[in-house]
Amino acid sequence: MRTMILTALLVTALATPALAQSYPVSGRWGESNSSEKGPIDCSGNRRIIYFLGDQRTDSNGGVPEYRNKSVQSVGQSDYRIVDEFNNGQVSNGQSEYTLRKIDSNHIVMNQSGTALNLQRCK
């Protein structure tokens, strides 16, 4: 009986998909170099990054949707993030970047030395 229970637990653990981690931020963030406090108006042609649970969408770029694979804290407000994506040309691609929380309304995504300054949307 004990062997059956252990076997059932092992099979269940192996059959359960790995759960992706959530991003360290959530909501809609617009591209902005402004230092103004508070959320900004994100209407118009502004680039929008939307973090929702373990998914991220980007209104500008070749890959519209990403799924988070891992989040590693590398400091008090810095994170190393790995996302997965699929599009017409790439299957199971990965995107690696760092995310820095400046304050509750400002973050910076840095991928391959290119910084994208974002501010929370209203």
Residue ranges and their predicted role:
Residues T16-A20:
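Sec/Tat signal peptide C-region and signal peptidase I cleavage site
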Residues Y23-S59, V90-Q94:
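Short, solvent-exposed loop/hinge segments that bridge or flank secondary-structure elements
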Residues S26-R28, L52-R56, G75-V82, S104-I107:
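Short, hydrophobic/aromatic-rich segments at coil-to-beta transitions
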Residues S35, D78-K122:
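Beta-sheet ligand-binding and adhesion/scaffold domains
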Residues R46-I49, R67-Q72, Q94-K101:
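Hydrophobic/aromatic beta-strand elements that line small-molecule binding cavities or substrate pockets
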